[in-house]
């Protein structure tokens, strides 16, 4: 545990940086870092700005790992790395955040300009201010406070500012892990890519994801003579109802997750015929399944095929299934892993709450680390406004999270 006096000094220094932290948020927000595939120019300008900031504020070995991308104006996507050296280099404590942001969406839904951040009632508003700049700024100022107080951490601190998180990470942390030996098994790796409003969730595991598109093909006919057609919509509706049996077929529970079960939900529905008096000959819907790690995804797919075959026989239709996304659950990080225990200690000290290791249904970039054998943990204190119009960061969360990182940096 950190010496109370050093920790108190660090706390006070971080609090003094409140205005500077908000200012950095606003400057970062003014540099849209949208992926080329989403209509943007990528993260190069933002990465260059951050590299200069890091050098000006005492970080060393600042570098950019450039993932080739011909769609980006500069031909690459930048992944920034920087260090603050401690007493020992035997281990590095990493905070990894991402520099890219999603597009603002419908502009009319914003109260202000999404890339001209504004402050209102203790919050910074703008695209990217919570996802992921809140904890990016928090981690940077935790280190800046250490330097200002002349406190040397026990081990090295690493800051990773990666690209392409919002569109798959192939040009981001995936590329870094595949092409460079940056991380080590003994390192502590914190990824602020998930959290809750209380700061009590440490994400250590994820469910498998299976998104399927189903096209049901029947025979179109006039609405007054349904016997001359085969109603694809009706067959698809019975199919959807039959798919609900997946909950009974796969009833396993795991208390690590919330909800503790596998979920199988029909979601998107495409329009079929445009008029009321036509029996549709084709119908399309999608299903989003989040499957517990102990359940074999391939087994679920086979069960769905059997259910579809039954509907085909009963209604004389054809059902085509197409995988939209399939991601098998990564090996979980142990709830006893050093990074989890470090976060628990820090959260208890800073927020006065008992955080616990949990699993979630959605995918996080920490899964990339876990598949590579690194026990990463996701944590942050968020209001979960990411990707929404009027996205905001609660300034007190940014300050508090900086203290959490500072606490971890000073732990033995």
Residue spans of the language-model regions?
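Acidic/histidine-rich catalytic neighborhood of metal-dependent amide-processing enzymes
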Residues: 130-205
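Glycine/serine-rich anion-binding loops at beta->alpha junctions
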Residues: 122-137, 222
